């Protein structure tokens, strides 16, 4: 049974709505909005605002605390205090912010820290950020070849380092050096300071992508490609606004460390990797990237094997009851049910009808692998082996670690076609 050391009435949950109107709000976020005693929100489009108001009638719009010439930091302090005050009254409060509620958001972090320090239950739920949208719309993978993310003014003030071998993402490029707020937009008159730094690091002809995520479902994102020098042109500079983000692709690819490749045994003895990583698809925004064919001999061989594919012996398809599927969905989307389960696993599991004995036992235990075994109808001996020998069980066939992605960098080292 899992119990909480925090017994104070009142809680704070911070959620995000994503960037694109309504559609990027998670089911988890929506469930907390619906269950809250009071909701405070700060969103950027009226459709999302209207949607929130249909899900909970006890809502407060935090956007009203901005004002022309008013310090944004003062506004953020006020926003956080408004939420914490209601938590202190014993209410279950939800704070809603656009995008990811913890990415380039000040009041969410402040309110959470204060609530936690005073002994209240407080947590943040993830959301879709502008950077997530950027990765999707520009079709880039932050893991290849790595990514640095900065706020533009901080990037300049603290002389943050740049790696010309990695992606660079700069937020708030439309309000460089501006600490206050204006309903009509920002006079970005220090923008040239940012351009100077980019030219210093990358040169005048290096590409920069001006990115704005789509905020409405009928819109397309802005993905305009310029050179650093073109950013100095007034007609282009004035397109950069408060919701603009810059993506700067790598200037060059870093050479592989041959000694490390040998130590990791990524290549057969005597085989030497390419000087430049060759990965398909290539980054369309990056200059001088080697072309790679989509159907190399190794790809064709892998595709040919599909004709003879059969699920391996260790693969376990889903084999769960409707009762178990329904209760796991309820735990994911019903905050009250989740609280009841966390308070007493056994009592909750006993109250659920139509579970199989293995499913009920797993739910009582609350162990994620026990639940996986029950829903996949896997032998309980696998779970027992894992408990007895820990990591050793994974070497004997227990799926202790699930790998759902392949790092392209390793693949590029191993391919010499």
Swiss-Prot record:
Keyword Transferase among record annotations: yes
Effect of residue 72 to A/K: Impairs methylation activity
Chain positions covered by the region annotation Clasp domain: 252-378
Active site per the UniProt annotation: 72, 76, 98
Entry's Gene Ontology BP terms: methylation
Pathway: Mycotoxin biosynthesis
Record note on biotechnological use: Omphalotins display strong and selective activity against the plant-pathogenic nematode Meloidogyne incognita but shows no further phytotoxic, antibacterial, or antifungal activities.
Binding residues annotated for S-adenosyl-L-methionine, in chain numbering: 98, 100, 103, 130, 172, 213, 244-245
Key words, A-Z: Methylation, Methyltransferase, S-adenosyl-L-methionine, Transferase, Virulence
Annotated segments matching region Precursor leader: 379-399
Function, as annotated: Fusion protein of the methyltransferase ophM and the omphalotin core peptide; part of the gene cluster that mediates the biosynthesis of omphalotin A, a highly methylated cyclic dodecapeptide with nematodicidal activity. Omphalotin A derives from the C-terminus of the ophMA protein, and it is the ophMA protein that methylates its own C-terminus using S-adenosyl methionine (SAM). The C-terminus is subsequently cleaved off and macrocyclized by the prolyloligopeptidase ophP to give the final product.
Self-association state and partner proteins as the record states: Homodimer.
Name of the featured protein: Methyltransferase/ribosomally synthesized cyclic peptide omphalotin A precursor ophMA
Organism per entry: Omphalotus olearius (Jack o'lantern)
């Amino acid at each position: 049974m899992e119990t909480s050391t925090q017994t104070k009435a009142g809680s704070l949950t911070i959620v995000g709505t994503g960037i694109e109107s309504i559609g990027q709000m998670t089911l988890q976020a929506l469930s907390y909005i619906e269950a809250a005693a009071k909701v405070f929100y700060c969103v950027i489009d009226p459709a999302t605002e209207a949607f929130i108001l249909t899900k909970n009638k006890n809502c407060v719009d935090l956007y009203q605390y901005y004002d022309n010439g008013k310090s944004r930091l003062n506004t953020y302090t006020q926003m956080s205090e408004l939420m914490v005050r209601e938590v202190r009254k014993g209410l279950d409060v939800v704070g809603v912010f656009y995008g990811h509620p913890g990415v380039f958001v000040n009041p969410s972090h402040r309110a959470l820290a204060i609530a936690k320090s005073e002994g209240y239950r407080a947590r943040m739920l993830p959301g879709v950020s502008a950077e997530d949208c950027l990765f999707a719309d520009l079709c880039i993978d932050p893991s290849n070849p790595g990514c640095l993310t900065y706020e533009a003014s901080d990037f300049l003030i603290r002389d943050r380092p740049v790696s010309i071998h990695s992606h660079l993402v700069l937020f708030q490029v439309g309000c460089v050096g501006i600490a206050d707020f204006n309903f009509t937009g920002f006079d970005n008159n220090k923008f040239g300071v940012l351009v100077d730094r980019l030219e210093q690091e990358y040169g005048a002809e290096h590409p920069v992508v001006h990115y704005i995520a789509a905020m409405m479902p009928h819109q397309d994102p802005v993905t305009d490609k310029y050179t650093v020098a073109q950013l100095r042109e007034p007609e282009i500079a004035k397109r950069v606004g408060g919701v603009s983000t810059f993506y700067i692709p790598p200037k060059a690819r870093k050479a592989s460390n041959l000694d490390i490749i040998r130590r990791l045994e990524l290549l057969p003895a005597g085989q030497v990797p390419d000087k430049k990583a060759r990965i398909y698809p290539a980054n369309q925004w990056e200059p001088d990237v080697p072309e790679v064919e989509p159907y190399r001999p190794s790809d064709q061989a892998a595709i040919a094997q599909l004709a003879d594919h059969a699920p391996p012996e260790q693969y376990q398809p889903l084999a769960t009851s409707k009762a178990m599927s329904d209760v796991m969905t309820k735990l994911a989307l019903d905050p009250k049910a989740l609280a009841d389960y966390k308070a007493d696993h056994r009592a909750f599991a006993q109250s659920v009808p139509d579970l199989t004995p293995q499913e009920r036992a797993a739910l009582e235990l609350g162990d994620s692998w026990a639940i996986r075994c029950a829903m996949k109808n896997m032998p309980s001996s696998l779970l027992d082996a894992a408990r007895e020998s820990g990591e050793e069980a994974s070497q004997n066939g227990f799926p202790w670690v699930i790998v759902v992605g392949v790092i392209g960098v390793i693949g590029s080292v191993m391919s010499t076609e």
